[in-house]
């Protein structure tokens, strides 16, 4: 009956042989009889309920691996590069620290929203799965919007620029608009090349550089406490905590929201495990431990690092340091040579983040190609010639290059930061508001929704309102001279973000409406279980003159069409 159906009853997943389908689905519950170590079902606990079929591929990621995925993605250059900007916008040490605490609370609430969706739909794909589950009509519309969001944003560009600035500082070379651009492009190209030619070497570099990140932030934190205790040379202290809230009155609504954007930029990555949940051992237990552990650890470390900055760096230097605050911190504590060494280490940390981001983005582009969403899908789905998503990686390299070269050099890092954060807030608002709608539907008895981890109405509502504020507030005009950009309008990142989503809407009209009408076919989709054991959506064209009216055909005819389409595309992409 309709009131007893699961929320995801239209996702069409089932079992056959190598390629498996279903035209209807019921609640998936792991029973005691199915928990068998031999068939891999021991990755789930008896009695757990899921709103989708479970991936059957190899489970490789445990708790420590998932903690590493989150920390390596979150700990990029944010805490090294944005603290100066946050202090400048807030006007005081106390308010700046409060912004870091507020950002951490927003990120933790977001983590629990993603954990709820992740334990309801423990499959690879992250927010794409959740958006498609919430916004089922018009079909393919939200998929096109999400594809545009992924395709046109240069996620790795900001940290590539920061890597360039850090390496130039380490070399004691003046940073100019062209050398930072040139090295920034070279950094992205290096990341593209490594991840394309040898995936194992790329992962090895990411892990090694991840150790550098943890070591740097721990060392800065300890040094800060030593400074507060008067343990530096000649008992030096900055005395920034004598009146911690002095200057708070200069903060504006525009400054607060942009400071919060910078903080949230530093927490991007808390949902990183959701992209690979199909490969996680016992995803419910793993998320319960890995998610909160990573977030609490990094939130505390971020606060300690900022306390260290304020304990050592005088206020005038805090304002002028911009992206090289960490290097100036080491300069004050240990001298000029330490500044150059610190800049090199922070540059390596940024490089590790670039490697991690382009690694993930290339695979998302490849997956969109495999599903059939992108034009020239076979091209983007290909793993030739090095068994890597080289085309997807190259696409992200091109977008990052344009993002690095297009804006004025002084504004490039902040533009990328805001250009990533703003549309991400739109996505997060849609997901959290959708979860509130699910709660309402469940309360009305219209759907079943009982994932193992629940964020709850209060946490989800807080995350929804936080993102709504972050969507609206950037339109408040800044006071004179307060704009975060020196050569561009303060609203430029908002316009670009909405333009990208608008393009996704236009693509939907052309790809999913006009072309099928002109070509006399319909786009149909099924969740397909491939030979690798992982479920993925497959979109295929079903021509009217081949099988008649698609809406009246039995599922077997359509499934046969998709299977053949899926097999042929797999063969072409190998």
Swiss-Prot record:
This is High-affinity methionine permease. Residues 83-92, 162-182, 229-293, 362-418, 477-490 are extracellular. It comes from the Eukaryota. Residues 1-61, 114-140, 204-207, 315-340, 440-455, 512-574 are cytoplasmic. It is found in: Membrane. GO terms for biological process: amino acid transmembrane transport; cysteine transport; methionine import across plasma membrane; methionine transport; sulfur amino acid transport. It is a multi-pass membrane protein. One of its GO terms (molecular function) is L-methionine secondary active transmembrane transporter activity. To yeast low affinity methionine permease (MUP3). High affinity permease for methionine. There is a cross-link at residue 28 (Glycyl lysine isopeptide (Lys-Gly) (interchain with G-Cter in ubiquitin)). One of its GO terms (cellular component) is cell periphery. Keywords: Amino-acid transport, Isopeptide bond, Membrane, Phosphoprotein, Transmembrane, Transmembrane helix, Transport, Ubl conjugation. The modification Phosphothreonine is found at residue 552. Coiled coil: none annotated. The modification Phosphoserine is found at residue 573. The chain crosses the membrane at residues 62-82, 93-113, 141-161, 183-203, 208-228, 294-314, 341-361, 419-439, 456-476, 491-511. It comes from Saccharomyces cerevisiae (strain ATCC 204508 / S288c) (Baker's yeast). InterPro entries: AA/rel_permease1, AminoAcid_Transporter.
């Amino acid at each position: 009956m309709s009131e007893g159906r699961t929320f995801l009853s239209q996702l069409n997943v089932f079992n056959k042989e190598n390629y498996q389908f279903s035209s209807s689905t019921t609640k998936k519950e792991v029973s005691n009889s199915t928990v068998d170590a031999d068939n891999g079902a021991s990755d789930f606990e008896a009695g757990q309920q899921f709103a989708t079929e479970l991936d059957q591929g190899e489970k490789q990621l445990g708790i420590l691996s998932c903690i590493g995925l989150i920390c390596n993605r979150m700990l990029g250059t944010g805490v090294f590069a944005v603290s100066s900007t946050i202090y400048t916008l807030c006007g005081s040490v106390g308010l700046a620290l409060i912004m870091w605490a507020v950002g951490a609370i927003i990120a933790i609430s977001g983590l629990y929203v993603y954990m709820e969706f992740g334990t309801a739909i423990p499959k690879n794909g992250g927010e794409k799965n959740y958006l498609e589950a919430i916004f089922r009509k018009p079909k393919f519309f939200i998929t096109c919007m999400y594809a545009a969001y992924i395709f046109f944003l240069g996620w790795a560009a900001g940290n590539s620029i920061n890597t360039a600035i850090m390496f130039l500082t380490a070399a004691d070379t003046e940073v100019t608009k062209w050398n930072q651009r040139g090295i920034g492009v070279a950094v992205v190209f290096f990341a593209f090349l490594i991840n394309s030619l040898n995936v194992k070497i790329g992962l090895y570099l990411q892990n090694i550089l991840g150790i550098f990140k943890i070591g740097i932030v721990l060392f800065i934190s300890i040094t800060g406490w030593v400074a507060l205790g008067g343990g530096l040379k000649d008992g030096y202290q900055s005395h920034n905590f004598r009146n911690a809230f002095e200057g708070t009155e200069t903060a504006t609504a525009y400054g607060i929201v942009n400071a919060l954007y910078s903080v949230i930029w530093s927490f991007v990555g808390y949902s990183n495990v959701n992209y690979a949940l199909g490969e996680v051992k016992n995803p419910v237990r793993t998320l319960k431990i890995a998610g909160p552990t990573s977030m609490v650890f990094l939130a505390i470390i971020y606060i300690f690092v900022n306390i260290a900055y304020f304990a050592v760096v005088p206020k005038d230097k805090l304002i002028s340091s911009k992206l090289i605050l960490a290097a100036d911190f080491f300069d004050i504590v240990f001298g000029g040579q330490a500044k150059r060494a610190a800049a090199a280490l922070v540059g390596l940390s940024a490089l590790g983040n670039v490697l991690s981001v382009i690694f993930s983005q290339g695979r998302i582009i490849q997956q969109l190609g495999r599903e059939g969403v992108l034009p020239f899908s076979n091209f983007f789905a290909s793993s030739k010639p090095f068994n890597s998503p080289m085309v997807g990686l190259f696409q992200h390299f091109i977008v990052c290059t344009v993002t690095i070269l297009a804006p004025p050099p002084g504004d490039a890092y902040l533009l990328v930061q805001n250009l990533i954060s703003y549309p991400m807030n739109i996505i997060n608002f849609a997901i959290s508001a959708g979860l509130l709608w699910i709660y309402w539907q469940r309360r009305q008895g219209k759907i079943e929704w009982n994932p193992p981890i629940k964020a709850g109405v209060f946490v989800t509502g807080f995350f929804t309102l936080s993102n709504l504020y972050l969507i609206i507030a950037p339109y408040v005009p800044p006071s004179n001279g307060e704009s975060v950009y020196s050569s561009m309008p303060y609203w430029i990142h908002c316009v670009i973000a909405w333009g990208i989503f608008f393009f996704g809407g236009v693509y939907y009209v052309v790809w999913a409406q006009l072309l099928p009408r002109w070509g006399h076919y319909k786009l149909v989709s099924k969740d397909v279980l491939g030979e690798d054991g992982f479920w993925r959506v497959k979109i295929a064209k079903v021509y009217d003159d081949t099988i008649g009216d698609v809406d009246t055909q039995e599922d077997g005819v359509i499934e046969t069409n998709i299977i053949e389409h899926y097999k042929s595309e797999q063969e072409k992409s190998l």
